Amino acid sequence: MTTLRSGHATSPRLTWYGPDSERVELSGRVLDNWVAKTSNLLQDELDAEPGMRLNLDLPAHWKSMIWALSAWQLGMETVLDGGEAELLVTDRPGTLEGKYDAVIAVALPALAMRWPGELPAGVLDYAAEVRSHGDVFMAHTDPSAAACAIRARAGQQHIHENLITGFAASHEEGVRLLVPASEGLEPALADALGAWHSGGSVVLAHPDVELTDKLLNAERIHGK
């Protein structure tokens, strides 16, 4: 999993196109840095450990990719079907339902330094907290390869050992893959893992972004 994130250290690994001409490009090194900081936040601030469940209530977005990779690095279970979990990561903290040990609010705009407005009591502001955490992650407890890594929307479960062989989509070697965010978080995660495993990279596009020939050519989209 570390190789998937950090490969191609100086070249694009994950590119995001969002509303209002937003473009975010993460090289392998920068992607790994974001995952390390988020993993440290989970472990050091929220006492996350292998086997804990994280409800990932976010749309397909570059930050939801970071959260999934971080949870897997700790050996956690990423919950996509809205089921029970100890932690909730959401961009909708004002509509909380269910009981969680901790709730983390994620502001989606790339330049957001904190949540825009007042948060419910006890909710952690991801944008305000994540940058203070370390750039290198060292797990306190070794995760189990046989533990559940993801609980998908249709009820399927995949263990950590089988994330690539059982969950990730198959893609051509070195693909520069266009992933429409409109298809949802689960397919986006599967596509991204498959593209990275093949030595490729991902362009993730918000549903409101017009996928013009100019954009596709500029990003050198190729392969399947």
Can you describe what each PLM-predicted range is?
Residues 2-26, 135-159:
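AMP-dependent adenylate-forming
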Residues 2-3, 69-145, 203-224:
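Structural core segment of the AMP-binding/adenylate-forming
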Residues 11, 32-55, 73, 162-178:
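ANL superfamily AMP-binding
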Residues 57-61, 181-185:
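Conserved AMP-binding
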Residues 70-73, 188-202:
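Conserved short alpha-helical elements in the N-terminal third of ANL/AMP-binding
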Residues 178-179, 204:
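Conserved binding-pocket/active-site segment within a compact domain
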